[in-house]
Amino acid sequence: MIVWRRRLPSMTLVTAILDLGRGEIASWGRRPYALYTTGLAQLLSRYRDVPVIVHVTAEDEPLVWRTRRRDNTRVVPTTRATLGALPWHGRVDAIRTSPSWADRAEWLRESPQRLLDGYLALVLAKLRWLCDAATANPFGTERFVWMDGGLPRNPSYARLSRRGFVRGLDVERFRVLSVPYTTNEEIHGFDRRACAQYCGTEFVSWIVRGGLFGGTGAAVAEVSELYDALLDDTLAHGHLGTEETLLTILAHRHPTLFQRHCLEGNR
């Protein structure tokens, strides 16, 4: 039996939640914002002995201090305006709102990434915020791990948020989790054939999941630099996916930098 008090490796967790209106969309991707607030509350309590950097609005900040101490927690004020100021927001939005992008798959037309302004900007910002944490390193830790604020409430991936799972990950470079992915003509909106070309493979048979990833400070900095360059290049060529698509490409291109743990099935 795993006891939560057992110490984890020296690490800083980075997370975020932001109400983008997902609870109001009339499609299969609708989720109440309470799912994210309760998930974040679970995460903050579960890792209350671990340094955490949280990106939230001023309205959600009281949730953080219900369970967290000031000496091991930092709050980064984050709003929709924060997302709008990201350097890639305009280019992302131009592709997101184009009919040609939405027509790549039926599911994409009604997806949160298509319908919600700020959704793609937020998920694409995860690595930047992780790198910011590694650069500042306010708690003097050796590793930096991104965990989605809603991960503890995700029906397919909640187990990845448990202390026992995180403790079992050997993070010596840049650790990612992958799943088999062999269907669809696109990968989160990114043309599958183009993705394979970027990956340097004939066919992309697995993708990286974006709910949990991280590494040493040096590895995070190196991956972040590669990620920013790749994001610029793919957007310049009209390609748009999510952070999972970009991390998938980088994990294929740089296998010695990445440590990949394959999860069972598409979960």
Predicted regions: what they are:
Residues 118, 122-177:
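GT-A fold catalytic core of metal-dependent nucleotide-sugar glycosyltransferases
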Residues 24-25, 63-67, 154-160, 187-189:
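A short acidic (Asp/Glu
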